[in-house]
């Protein structure tokens, strides 16, 4: 089969398999690529091609992740699968592989297990918007009532973490049987569950809002003044569009102020607008060089606010990853690196947590000494004197 052309016409969605070790995440990933390949919509990736995932470094953290891609009739998917539990934790917290949705794999023979629970919690904390469930190894359960019990258990578990457990689609099947058959036909007992699963993913997981459609936001990287013209802030536009004459806010570090964009330039050329992904300079009306600094953001008025206190999920690097050699305790005071700047913060560990060891993931409440423009799901690094010792994500803004 010739390599499927990357269709720009189909919406693109990032997805991943999550769930307990040995419940069949990688087998399912292989089965999906094979079923879609049989339908002319993907290139087949075998189990061991996916399982021997290369290690990547994201913010100094080593993560093994396999990336596969395939299409359905309506969408183009990039799918991530991680070989180890620790890789999932790191991946979800750092946002290394952005997930617009997830396929939760649960073995029908075992039911939900500790990592099933942990992955659902992480998905909730880091803001994975929706998931679909695949009850794998259904061929090993011949008792209809037992299947129903497992399904009920999964739904209750999802509901307990604020996912709509009653509405989430659950598809039962055997990834291994589908992989062994590989015909990809609608009427095949082995392959049908995979096709049904992908139909559910197509319809139930919402299409992500593109960065360009979100409100304008640009983290300030550098500031300089141009004599006779005013002050220019430079940076990469994170989301949205900014046009000349737009009113914007400067948010974070100090009092929020309003100003008007009097010019946008890119590669020394003047433009009418800048958009998500562009590296631009923004000329600001009536703003002094000292009124604005790295670490602030330019944003659409009212779209983002500065905060000092938030809850977070964090992963703390191991010694081998270049992190700390010792645990830390309540009251730990590292720097939190948001977008373009470090801010000192004080960590309050979750109740019942005495200390956090290198290699742990932890829930904590953080108090920053300076306010930063933030929203739920904002990623950050934890640093000590410029060295990264952890990575985290804002799970809730408090004040």
From Swiss-Prot:
Chain positions covered by the region annotation G3: 81-84
Record EC number: 3.6.5.3
Domain tr-type G: start-end pairs: 10-209
- Keyword terms: Cytoplasm, Elongation factor, GTP-binding, Hydrolase, Magnesium, Metal-binding, Nucleotide-binding, Protein biosynthesis
Major localization listed first in the record, in broad terms: cytoplasm
Please give one Gene Ontology molecular function term for this protein.
GTP binding
Residue span of region G5: 174-176
SUPFAM superfamilies named in the record: EF-Tu/eEF-1alpha/eIF2-gamma C-terminal domain, P-loop containing nucleoside triphosphate hydrolases, Translation proteins
Q: Where in the cell is it found?
A: Cytoplasm
Q: Where is this region: G2?
A: 60-64
Family of the protein in this entry? Belongs to the TRAFAC class translation factor GTPase superfamily. Classic translation factor GTPase family. EF-Tu/EF-1A subfamily.
Query: What role does this protein play?
Result: GTP hydrolase that promotes the GTP-dependent binding of aminoacyl-tRNA to the A-site of ribosomes during protein biosynthesis.
What's the name of the protein?
Elongation factor Tu 1
Traced from the root, the source organism's taxonomic lineage reads: Bacteria, Pseudomonadati, Thermodesulfobacteriota, Desulfuromonadia, Desulfuromonadales
């Amino acid at each position: 089969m010739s390599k499927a052309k990357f269709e720009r016409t189909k919406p693109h969605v990032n997805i991943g398999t999550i769930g307990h070790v040995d419940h069949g995440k990688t087998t399912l990933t292989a089965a999906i690529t094979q079923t879609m390949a049989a339908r002319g919509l993907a290139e087949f990736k075998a189990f061991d091609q996916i399982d021997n995932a290369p290690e990547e470094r994201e913010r100094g953290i080593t993560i093994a992740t396999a990336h596969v891609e395939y299409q359905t009739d309506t969408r183009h998917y990039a799918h991530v699968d991680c070989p180890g539990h620790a890789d999932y934790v790191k991946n979800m917290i750092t946002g290394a592989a952005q997930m617009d949705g997830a396929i939760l794999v649960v073995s029908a023979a075992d039911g939900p297990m500790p990592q099933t629970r942990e992955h659902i919690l992480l998905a909730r904390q880091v803001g994975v918007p929706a998931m679909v469930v695949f009850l794998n190894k259904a061929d090993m359960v011949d008792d209809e009532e037992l299947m129903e019990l497992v399904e009920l258990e999964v739904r209750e578990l999802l509901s307990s973490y604020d996912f709509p457990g009653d509405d989430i689609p659950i598809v039962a099947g055997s990834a291994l049987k589908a992989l062994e058959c590989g015909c990809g036909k609608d009427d095949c007992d082995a392959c049908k569950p995979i096709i049904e699963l992908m139909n559910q993913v197509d319809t139930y997981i919402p299409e992500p809002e593109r960065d360009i459609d979100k409100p304008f936001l640009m983290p300030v990287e550098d500031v300089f003044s141009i004599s006779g013209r005013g002050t220019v802030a430079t940076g990469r536009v994170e989301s949205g569009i900014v046009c000349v004459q737009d009113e914007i806010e400067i948010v974070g570090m100090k009092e929020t102020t309003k100003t008007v964009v009097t010019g946008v330039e890119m590669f020394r050329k003047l433009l009418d607008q800048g958009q998500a992904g562009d590296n631009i300079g923004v000329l600001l009306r009536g703003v002094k060089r000292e009124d604005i600094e790295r670490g602030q953001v330019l944003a659409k008025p009212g779209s983002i606010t500065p905060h000092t206190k938030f809850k977070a999920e964090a992963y703390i690097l191991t010694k081998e990853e270049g992190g700390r050699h010792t645990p830390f305790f309540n009251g730990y005071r590292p720097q939190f690196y948001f977008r373009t700047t470090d801010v000192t913060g004080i960590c309050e560990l979750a109740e019942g947590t005495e200390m956090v060891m290198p290699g742990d993931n932890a829930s904590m409440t953080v108090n920053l000494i300076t306010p930063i423009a933030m929203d739920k799901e904002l990623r950050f690094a934890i640093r000590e004197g410029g060295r990264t010792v952890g990575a985290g994500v804002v799970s809730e803004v408090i004040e």
